[in-house]
């Protein structure tokens, strides 16, 4: 097997050097114990990834406000704990992550309106928060509408003072990650969570400093990046994951590229391209399948078209592309053709935490056999009949943990 471009080191803008370009992308672990701090189960999972030979590991999303979680078992910044208590817990986690030299980043998030009932400490009668009071649309029909109303409710619009508080919560979480010994953080601005809700006109109808124009919709994210940067040294890695947009809608594409101009100028070290929301879970399904073999590149690299646009507009910014990759050849093609600098692998990494060593960079494994296994589980018939897209997706098996 010839040397792969994906196996070559890459140095990010902050000076952090990754030993290769294969990244364990973020996945919500969903096993946090009460208190939202990492326990032995979390450390055991990351101990496996630390041995895998990944270029970088990005943790599952850690919520910056434990009142609002994406699932009831998310890790979060525990509001009941002091900074020193959190650092003591996170330091044990970070020590496991870096024991084999793998750079590990903590992904920071706020779920916004995508906080299901019972997740977090905000109480059953307290509404979720969002840039604008617009509820989730989980599908057409009575059942999807009822599920949306019961599970998520209609969010309330955030006040400016609350937006500023959340901005500082991201900054505090980044400071805690730095003190704990992690190599950096990734700010989650994708998948329909709070920052993505601010970026998108459909979910942000504000007319103040945080909405009404492309630039003002990006203000929340830019303020977060600036606040994070003020709390950590320049050598501490700060990345952003952001949603792809469909290039068939030129005005939306222009808006997103403009927002990325602001993001790159704010001082991020890399950008990750992903996609999907609870309403439209492209992160699981990908875009519509190609109709011909000539377009098979898109059957694996879900968001490759948008990634190519971003790569051409911002050639000096390392680009991480995540979503759909299932074989060595497609990963190598994405890196060599300039679509991205790095490739993110999520669910196959749960099935095989040692994937870089045992498959991707194993010279004894032929290209034809170098597949990234991720079995599918069909949603039960009754769930599929409900018409709720997010429940009907093929959920991959991550029970290997």
Swiss-Prot record:
Gene3D superfamilies: Aldolase class I (3.20.20.70). Its EC number is 1.-.-.-. GO terms for molecular function: FMN binding; oxidoreductase activity. It comes from the Eukaryota. Substrate binds at residues 188-191. Keywords: Flavoprotein, FMN, NADP, Oxidoreductase. The keyword Flavoprotein applies. FMN binds at residues 25-28, 107, 346-347. It holds the Pfam family Oxidored_FMN. Belongs to the NADH:flavin oxidoreductase/NADH oxidase family. NADH-dependent flavin oxidoreductase; part of the gene cluster that mediates the biosynthesis of ilicicolin H, a 4-hydroxy-2-pyridonealkaloid that has potent and broad antifungal activities by inhibiting the mitochondrial respiration chain. The biosynthesis of ilicicolin H starts with formation of the tetramic acid by the hybrid PKS-NRPS synthetase iliA with the partnering trans-enoyl reductase iliB since iliA lacks a designated enoylreductase (ER) domain. The cytochrome P450 monooxygenase iliC then catalyzes the ring expansion of the tetramate to the acyclic 2-pyridone. This is NADH-dependent flavin oxidoreductase iliE. It comes from Hypocrea jecorina (strain QM6a).
């Amino acid at each position: 097997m010839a040397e792969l471009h994906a196996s070559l080191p890459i140095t990010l803008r902050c000076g952090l050097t990754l030993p290769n370009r294969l990244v364990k992308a973020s996945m919500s672990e969903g096993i946090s114990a009460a208190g939202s701090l990492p326990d032995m189960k979390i450390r055991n999972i990351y101990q496996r990834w630390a041995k895998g030979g990944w270029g970088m590991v990005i943790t599952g999303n850690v919520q910056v406000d434990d009142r609002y979680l994406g699932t009831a078992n998310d890790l979060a910044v525990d509001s009941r704990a002091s900074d020193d208590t959190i650092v003591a817990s996170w330091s044990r986690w970070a020590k496991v992550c870096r024991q084999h030299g793998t750079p590990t980043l903590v992904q920071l998030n706020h779920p916004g309106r995508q906080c299901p009932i019972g997740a977090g400490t905000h109480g059953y009668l307290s509404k979720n928060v969002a840039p604008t009071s617009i509820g989730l649309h989980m599908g057409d029909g009575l059942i999807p509408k009822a599920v949306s109303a019961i599970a998520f409710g209609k969010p309330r619009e955030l006040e400016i003072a609350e937006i500023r508080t959340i901005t500082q919560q991201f900054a505090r979480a980044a400071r805690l990650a730095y003190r704990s010994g992690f190599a950096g953080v990734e700010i989650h601005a994708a998948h329909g969570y709070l920052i993505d809700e601010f970026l998108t006109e459909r979910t942000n109808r504000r007319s103040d400093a945080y909405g009404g124009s492309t630039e003002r919709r990006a203000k929340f994210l830019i303020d977060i990046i600036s606040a994070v940067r003020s709390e950590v040294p320049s050598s501490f890695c700060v990345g952003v994951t952001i949603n792809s947009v469909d290039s068939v809608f030129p005005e939306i594409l222009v808006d997103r590229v403009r927002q990325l101009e602001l993001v790159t100028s704010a001082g991020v070290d890399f950008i990750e391209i992903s996609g999907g929301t609870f309403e439209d879970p492209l992160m699981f399904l990908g875009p519509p399948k190609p109709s011909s073999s000539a377009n098979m590149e898109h059957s694996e690299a879900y968001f490759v078209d948008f990634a190519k646009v971003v790569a051409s507009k911002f050639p000096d910014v390392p680009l991480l592309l995540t979503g759909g990759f299932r074989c060595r050849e497609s990963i190598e093609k994405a890196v060599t053709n300039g679509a991205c600098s790095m490739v993110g692998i999520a669910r196959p990494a749960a099935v095989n935490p040692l994937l870089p060593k045992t498959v991707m960079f194993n010279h004894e494994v032929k290209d034809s056999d170098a597949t990234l296994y991720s079995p599918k589980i069909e949603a039960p018939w009754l769930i599929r009949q409900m018409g709720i897209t997010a429940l009907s997706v093929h959920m991959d098996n991550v029970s290997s943990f």
